[in-house]
């Protein structure tokens, strides 16, 4: 059963069309990530779901009840939707407990018990309850904001870049904790982010937006390995795009013969590999002939864990750049053997 249904949502600001024909379903307890470049319309879409913006056309339905259609517009505060903004937006004049209590109903004792339960749910130390927002860390502030949103028992949780202000290590652990918490509570969630890796790791469903349209919606691994087009492929991660001539059998390209995910295609086309599909094996000497593809390292861009190797493919006299895990023994001038793992993805023209 779907928690949220979007049907043909459109939105314009004066003559500028920012959303066009948006169809999207979010199932109960699932996690959806909406990604796209700046100006693609993802924030506007989330604001429409929350009730902060009104679409020009279409329908928004939550648990079978219309939030917006030609005759209905439910205001934001009556939608039963939780909202966690980028910076948490905690009330600075309330303690952590006071922020969590905001909007809770019941007696003082009931609220206190509910605050304790919510702090436990988001793994917040009870000793933080009486601290002010500026006295706790960024990760703790985001957990307070999440607890405050959970206190309303929402059917749907909206998360706007909620981890972007955290440092790298804290971002990963907080993201995992939030994902697990929402799943355990069976609360559907929508994350808006510009971080592709964050979207892929958080979500069960990823929706890629471009120029006000949803261009590809599906499971993270499906979108990553079989994107609908080249712009989507490059947006979701590093790519190696090649132009082989496909004949009966495996196509031949700069990296040798490559297995593809659509063997029925023939003729000139473009294929995609992800960098992790290319295994780079150093050769003891230039006279050791590989069984796959011989290349020479012509430059190295070292960036810590990852390095970008610029390679000259000997047989085809072509240059390719491949990102790989940094390791000792790799240097300019080294001859290497390139082996492709798995299938290349063919783009449909």
Swiss-Prot record:
CDD domains: ABC_Carb_Solutes_like (cd03259). It is a peripheral membrane protein. Residues 4-236 form the ABC transporter domain. Pfam families: ABC_tran (PF00005). Its main location: membrane. It is found in: Cell inner membrane. It comes from the Bacteria. GO terms for cellular component: plasma membrane. InterPro entries: AAA+_ATPase, ABC_SmlMolc_Importer, ABC_transporter-like_ATP-bd, ABC_transporter-like_CS, ABC_transpr_FbpC, P-loop_NTPase. Part of the ABC transporter complex FbpABC involved in Fe(3+) ions import. Responsible for energy coupling to the transport system. The complex is composed of two ATP-binding proteins (FbpC), two transmembrane proteins (FbpB) and a solute-binding protein (FbpA). This is Fe(3+) ions import ATP-binding protein FbpC. The gene is fbpC.
